C-alpha cells in the first residue's frame, strides 16, 4: 500500500513552479500536464504522504487526488525554502493499486 498519509490542507494562495523541460518530458511520458497536476492541490479529498524512498536531499511528498479533468493523479512534489511555493517533480495517473488504496482511506 501507499505510505501513511499526512492530513494537510492546501490553500488558495499556493504558488507552483517546475522545470519546463521536465514538464514537457512528463507530458510525453505520462500524458499528464503539470498544469493539470496543479488542480489536484485544490481537491478537498486529496491525500498527501511523505515519500521517504526518494527524499535524499529534500523531503519529497506524494499527493493523490482528482484533477479538474476528474483524473485520479499521483503528483510528486517538494516545498521550496519559502514554504509557500510547491515545486512539481512529476505527475501521472494513479495505478489500479494506488486507486484502491486511495478509495480505502
Task: Give the location of each predicted region.
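Ribonuclease/tRNase effector modules and their secretory precursors
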Residues: 1-105
